[in-house]
Amino acid sequence: IRMMTKDHEYLYPYSAQEAKKRNQLPMWRESYHANVACRKAIEETVRQNFDGMHLKKDCLEPVLAEYGYKRTEWVLATTLQELSWDGRFSRANKQWAARRYIPQDERHNAEITVRSHPAILDGFVDLYREAYQKLGLFGPEHCVGDRAEQDYIGKVLVLSPDTLKESFWSQENQLWYAHDGFGCSPHAIGRSVRCTCLSDGEMTRWNRDEFVGVLDEKFLPDWAKESLSQFQQEESAESPGMNNQSM
């Protein structure tokens, strides 16, 4: 796995209630305060960079530099989910926000709801989505099949950007070849998948739910095709030997 940019403070993915159950309230609190600070930074950058007609294109950069993509997305998605009744947000942006799981937490979610004018904030969401798109990361739209029913053995899997720190965000760090493990089976209780990174050959275990799904072959980059055929050759060379031993 190769590192790209700096790391940002950990984004805690559960509600305060869930954090209490898990005995993780300090982690939740730290992340929540950062979410509120990110909300205020968005409000400030929108205020400073809107000239009455247009929002400056580069107004997103200081927010991303300070808070990162994950937290910025969390705050924007929470805002659009909280204000889903507001017709000033585009349908496309509302649908985008709805795809992001935000835990129910009425009081705290209200605190991270951006208070900028919705029509201007909608433009800010557009800028964020464009910036994320330019990163060229793999997502559910690059995967095939029904994740709930798929067997992962021998497949190229897409590691979720949520699983990786932002400093490791790249296609090279997302593509993994699944060897075995209980997590390869959709209905097993065990979740672990033993796999190898196609770009650098690092072998490790990830949990099944840390993957977005199985990559559609048409999106497989050339550099990954070589590694993949090498793994497939090695595995097919190993399997006849194993069959002979069992006879």
Model regions: which residues?
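Gram-negative host-targeted secretion-system effectors, predominantly Type III and Type IV
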Residues: 1-246
